[in-house]
UniProtKB/Swiss-Prot annotation:
The lineage of its organism: Eukaryota, Fungi, Dikarya, Ascomycota, Pezizomycotina. One of its GO terms (biological process) is methylation. One of its GO terms (molecular function) is sterol 24-C-methyltransferase activity. Pathway: Steroid metabolism; ergosterol biosynthesis. The gene is erg6. This is Sterol 24-C-methyltransferase erg6. Keywords: Endoplasmic reticulum, Lipid biosynthesis, Lipid metabolism, Methyltransferase, Microsome, Mitochondrion, S-adenosyl-L-methionine, Steroid biosynthesis, Steroid metabolism, Sterol biosynthesis, Sterol metabolism, Transferase. Its main location: other. It comes from Aspergillus fumigatus (strain ATCC MYA-4609 / CBS 101355 / FGSC A1100 / Af293). Belongs to the class I-like SAM-binding methyltransferase superfamily. Erg6/SMT family.
Length: 377
């Protein structure tokens, strides 16, 4: 694959669009409450810009040129995806936008936090370290890792709306003295060389057009001797791009999750090593012999539910829960309380959910390929 040309950043343009689309909705509670504060014209622009990469482009007709067009606009694609999907994520999943492993008897949000703790533990993050969270979302993992380690964390994000929400949550939890958020493209960070004691990424660098490129940027800003840890989204090496069903699953995941270019485990490992890291540990945590699969909430599987408090999280993911959300979003669009495109975005998330479950069941996809590496002294 040819080197990817980086998109030119324009923070003023992005800030103006954020104000136009989201207004003051970053100050609202997450989920459906925040959807009521959107500007319809800006929402339509985001919908059109995002879905132009997917509409009328089925898996059976996919070409390398189609994928190259998505890679060329990786930053815009990701930014508009989260302009559209953030509130729906918070409604359905909470403020930590990632998957996790589950233990018997473990409530959903406890399992989510444990997954974050496990990465911090594997990396050896300690009190007082200066740590970078690459692709921080609305700051759920960063807040948890600050509380778990007492490190100082900087969250990097290319979406203004998510930064506003992350900043608000940090202030509300009294963590602003330990946690800050910076606007930027992780393919071309503005931090000086050797800035951070440790860097982590939780299911975020999958949005890169080229994993080697983002890993090299992380290597650059990491201090010598520092450690980088990542939970990466990858197709397993059982994935066959010439298999139409495999390709449909991958494309469904990419469509519903704002991904321009997902690759296989072997390519991810090569990218990690080529970036210069000394590989300390690599493992597909989805391959652990867990009794409860990582994708069970997406499957709407009550049989694996271990806490009554998880009922509503699981219920939202059932076929009838998704059906209710589909009809509710459509009705709210019709009466003008939600902007047009909300239902289409929610439907794309449902497609992704089905494909994530299929990818997990068929061992074609993992959202938790763990790689930990050190930058040589």
């Amino acid at each position: 694959m040819a080197p990817v040309a980086l998109e030119q950043e324009n923070h003023l343009r992005d800030a103006e669009f954020n104000r136009a689309m989201h207004g003051k909705s970053a100050q609202f509670r997450g989920g459906f409450a925040a959807l009521r504060g959107k500007d319809s014209a800006a929402q339509k622009a985001a919908v059109d810009e995002y879905f132009k990469h997917w509409d009328n482009k089925p898996a059976e007709d996919e070409t390398e040129e189609t994928r190259a067009a998505r890679r060329a606009e990786y930053a815009t694609l990701t930014r508009h995806y989260y302009n559209l999907a953030t509130d729906l994520y918070e409604y359905g999943w909470g403020t930590s936008f990632h998957f996790c492993r589950f233990a018997q008897g473990e409530p959903f949000y406890q399992a989510i936090a444990r997954h974050e703790h496990y990465l911090a533990h594997q990396m050896g993050i300690k009190e007082g370290m200066k740590v970078l969270d690459v692709g921080c979302g609305v700051g759920g993992p960063a807040r948890e890792i600050v509380k778990f380690t007492d490190a100082n964390v900087v969250g990097l994000n290319n979406n203004d709306y998510q930064i506003e929400r992350a900043t608000r949550y940090a202030e509300r939890e009294g963590l602003s003295h330990k946690l800050s958020f910076v606007k930027g493209d992780f393919m071309q960070m503005k931090f000086p060389d050797n800035s951070f004691d440790a860097v982590y990424a939780i299911e975020a660098t999958v949005h890169a057009p080229d994993l080697e490129g983002v890993y090299k940027e992380i290597f650059r800003v990491l201090k010598p001797g520092g450690v980088f840890g990542v939970y990466e989204w990858l197709m397993t090496d059982a994935y066959d791009n010439d298999n139409p069903e495999h390709r449909r699953i991958r494309l469904g995941i990419e469509l519903g999750d704002g991904i321009s270019n997902m690759v296989k485990v072997s390519e991810g490992l090569t990218a990690f090593k080529n970036a210069g890291f000394e590989l300390l540990h690599n493992e597909d945590l989805a391959d652990r012999p867990d009794a409860i699969p990582w994708y069970y909430p997406l499957a709407g599987s009550f049989k694996h539910m271990t806490s009554p408090w998880d009922f509503f999280t699981i219920a939202r993911m059932t076929w009838w829960g998704r059906g209710i959300a589909h009809r509710f979003c459509g009705a709210m669009e019709t009466i003008g309380l939600f902007p047009k495109g909300t239902q289409k975005t929610a439907d794309s998330l449902a497609i992704a959910g089905d494909c994530l479950v299929a990818g997990g069941e068929k061992k074609l996809f993992t959202p938790m390929y763990l790689m930990v590496g050190r930058k040589p002294e």
